[in-house]
A protein has these predicted regions:
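Intrinsically disordered, low-complexity, charged/polar segments
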Residues: 48-85
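Surface-exposed, flexible loop/turn segments at secondary-structure boundaries
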Residues: 18, 36-38
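Conserved beta-strand residues within beta-sheet cores
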Residues: 7, 27-29, 76
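Short aromatic-glycine-enriched beta-strand elements
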Residues: 38-44
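Residue-level recognition of conserved beta-strand positions in structured domain cores
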Residues: 14, 44-46
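Short coil-to-beta transition motif at edge beta-strands of beta-rich domains
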Residues: 2-17
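Short beta-strand-centered aromatic/proline hotspots
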Residues: 21-34
Length: 85
């Protein structure tokens, strides 16, 4: 498990990156670690959405809950702490 603190910026992949497929992820600032959605998650304010553009901001500015762990399709690097790179 990675080390994440409140105020850190993380990247969370929606799907495992693969050759030949565009990466799908959000980046955001960690507001807190919470269980308010029924699972342990990083509550983030999204600062970048890989699918957004000038016309459609996607999830930018929205609150997103990133699971700390998942039981299905978990892989190393699903969540990256960009503040510690």
């Amino acid at each position: 498990m990675i080390k994440v603190n409140v105020g850190d910026t993380i990247r969370s992949y929606d799907f495992k990156p693969m050759v030949g497929r565009e990466d799908c992820f959000v980046e955001g600032v960690v507001e807190r670690v919470t269980t308010e959605q029924g699972y342990k998650a990083y509550k983030i304010t999204v600062t970048k959405d890989s699918w957004s553009d000038a016309e459609d901001k996607g999830r930018v500015g929205k609150i997103v809950f990133v699971p700390v762990e998942v039981s299905f399709m978990e892989y190393a690097g699903r969540v990256i702490n960009l503040s510690r790179i």
